[in-house]
UniProtKB/Swiss-Prot annotation:
Subcellular location: Cell inner membrane
Keyword Coiled coil carried by entry: no
Protein name per UniProt: Na(+)/H(+) antiporter NhaB
Membrane-protein topology: Multi-pass membrane protein
InterPro entries found in the cross-reference section: Na+/H+_antiporter_NhaB
Physiological role: Na(+)/H(+) antiporter that extrudes sodium in exchange for external protons. Can also transport lithium and potassium.
Regions that span the bilayer: 23-43, 45-65, 90-110, 136-156, 204-224, 237-257, 305-325, 350-370, 392-412, 450-470, 479-499
Amino acid sequence: MPISLGNAFIKNFLGKAPDWYKVAIIAFLIINPIVFFLINPFVAGWLLVAEFIFTLAMALKCYPLQPGGLLAIEAIAIGMTSPAQVKHELVANIEVLLLLVFMVAGIYFMKQLLLFIFTKILLGIRSKTLLSLAFCFAAAFLSAFLDALTVIAVVISVAVGFYSIYHKVASGNPIGDHDHTQDDTITELTRDDLENYRAFLRSLLMHAGVGTALGGVTTMVGEPQNLIIADQAGWLFGEFLIRMSPVTLPVFICGLITCALVEKLKVFGYGAKLPDNVRQILVDFDREERKTRTNQDVAKLWVQGIIAVWLIVALALHLAAVGLIGLSVIILATSFTGVIEEHSMGKAFEEALPFTALLAVFFSIVAVIIDQELFKPVIDAVLAVEDKGTQLALFYVANGLLSMVSDNVFVGTVYINEVKSALMEGLITREQFDLLAVAINTGTNLPSVATPNGQAAFLFLLTSALAPLIRLSYGRMVVMALPYTVVLAIVGLMGIMFFLEPATASFYDAGWIAPHTGDLTPVVSGGH
């Protein structure tokens, strides 16, 4: 029976999303203007943030771009923020957007090399605990020099490769032409293996994700907000590393211990081993690849290896904006591996562009947070505290809590600007400012692993094409991140309270760093 036109509109709205979800989004769209105009703009702002988090939490039911975008468009339409403020946010974050557009696509053209290296690691290390530590450590090391998003893009690219190899064989299809998103052709015997394999990949991805946070906090190029904080404090690479170390070193060590413990104890969804059948398939695949590898393929691997060296050097030395380095990777990799058709290049951009659009929506929510001054009460309360030690601990906690709901780049920027203003007005000393900058940096980077909205890398993982394949939902990510969240947050707080001041004083005495004197550059705008 054909449906009526009215029903057709309803059916088309948000497509296959469940009916209750559609009703919830429509309810949000009706409630927001009422709260904004009749009750309180501040309450409406927090309501919008909560609704946006809800759309992220339901990412597997419906990609957050559509519902989140509708909420953002309405927020701008009713005056919660302005298109100019949204544009200001986007312009201020142009580096992150360029990174997503070009760097993720650049990694796509390095796939053969990455699969080659990671297959060796995966098949070479039999112990799951050691393998998890290797993934966590490698992600941390890379994130200290590259951006966390780039590292996660690498890991996702590798995981999709592994997943599709097994899926093809289990479905009885030839390696060439196969759709790894469909499970219909898989037999019951292999279905258990597939579930275990999904759990295995999930745990490795989460270890790598947390690894990016462990490494990203240590250096000024690790995360975008680190650059902003270092810039405001006038620190260079070496000084940033040394000033952070009283907090970041204990956190890094405890993070790796946590990684080993959750695997050994098989808690919080960790501990799944690589099923033997799957290992055999990967071993066969590796052998087959080696047999059929021509000189042309070997040449491609060499070229990709050289480009990988260029990528790490260029990023570590900050030779250009991250996205532009990504563009150079695309140009070099495609030129020297012979990818010259437009349609075969287009595939590389499929993964990141929906997320880039989602991030633009995210920044419009950030614009609402700025215009409605949603974080102001928290910031004012913390700055009003007299005792310096308590102030440090509170800054860390407040940053951590806000970073869990909002983008850590935004939280870090807002806080460092407020502290800078306090310094300019003579409310705090330069010495206290330096300590607070450490508290802000570690506060935004460490506890924010709690939820995918805190870390852009986690959000990218959650909304990637891989997440539904390995059944990685928002809730599952929060549960799997929980042991790390607790350990990182508590050890970080201990570092701030007990190690930071004495260690900084001994660094001064040893002459590794010198106390800063004099004024700083004026404060940057409230954006980023």
